[in-house]
């Protein structure tokens, strides 16, 4: 049994209590002291349920992302590695526009692990076998085994151009690197770009065909060389960082197709922290990743996870006939029904993995949509 499953089992066992088969009438007019005692007990139990949920969420995220531990990436490293490029900004803008509450068109996933939608791979220095006097310094891209050639929707190479001294035409060249003994390089793309004086820009190049070959024949991936010459022969492509150029190195953005999904239906009892409801109910819970010290999660910085808490008394079991039958069949020694999530939905997350690659994917079963007795 996985650690995550143990945590969930513990929280379920703690949430379970004996089914109340006593005299229902006797509880209709309790004393004030009894009410206060029950409310105090309910608050303590609810707080315990919340803490258990937070603890389980941390373990679930690492498990679903197939991480043994949280990547050791500090805020300074995040600032250095984050590309200041349009595709990343578009993803971040989605969180600003949609917020944490957006549920329109939400779906539930069958898979227990995260599904990848977009991968952003940063350029690194290529293998010495393709270099002469340690040149070129750029660019090699390593790819996650999650990427399958037949699932690639789009693959774009993003290159940042330094400002030209005057309006000019820039010749952007992409060459595939090969061992020096085999010729060193082979040009695969060449573009002409008109630029204005003093203006920086990001340029994107379609590299789906190249990436497909690399994935099918990994031994051919030695990296690429990028040049962007203006009319005076100046290379404007940023392929090594200088002062003030953090986040401007080339990177590849790979869009992956998603798997099948189902439309989610919402229903169930909702409560807030001030509610006096004793029945099984869904309560709000905001998870703040900064409180966890998880700087490796780029977005969202927080999300609404929700949690379940409350009683599953005999009088409520008519809503859950299967649980009622189980308890009637074995009235002694049973823990009774538990208040647990009966419907959950995924969250989208932008994060660094252990290889310092930026991943945009979907993590299933992270938001409690409905609670019930089972």
From Swiss-Prot:
Disulfide bonds: 271-281, 280-339, 308-371, 312-373
Function: Acts specifically as a negative regulator of skeletal muscle growth. May down-regulate muscle-specific transcription factors such as myod and myog.
Database matches in InterPro entries: Cystine-knot_cytokine, TGF-b_C, TGF-b_propeptide, TGF-beta-rel, TGFb_CS
Subcellular location: Secreted
Induction context: Repressed in adult muscle, and stimulated in adult spleen, when fish are grown in overcrowded conditions.
GO molecular function: cytokine activity; growth factor activity
Origin species: Danio rerio
Sorted UniProt keywords: Cleavage on pair of basic residues, Cytokine, Disulfide bond, Glycoprotein, Growth factor, Secreted, Signal
Protein name in UniProt: Growth/differentiation factor 8
GO cellular component: extracellular region; extracellular space
Disruption phenotype: Defects produce a giant phenotype.
Glycosites: 72, 274
Signal peptide: 1-22
GO biological process: cardiac muscle myoblast proliferation; immune response; muscle organ development; negative regulation of cardiac muscle myoblast proliferation; negative regulation of growth; negative regulation of growth rate; negative regulation of skeletal muscle tissue development; negative regulation of striated muscle tissue development
Keyword Magnesium: no
Subunit relationships: Homodimer; disulfide-linked.
Tissues where the protein occurs: Predominantly expressed in muscle. At hatching, expression is strongest in the skin epithelium, and is also found in the retina and brain. From day 28, expressed in skeletal muscle. In the adult, highest expression is seen in the gastrointestinal tract, brain, muscle, heart and testis. Also expressed in the adult pharynx, kidney, spleen, liver, gill, eyes, skin, swim bladder and ovary.
Protein family membership: Belongs to the TGF-beta family.
Annotated propeptide span(s): 23-265
Family annotation (Pfam families): TGF_beta, TGFb_propeptide
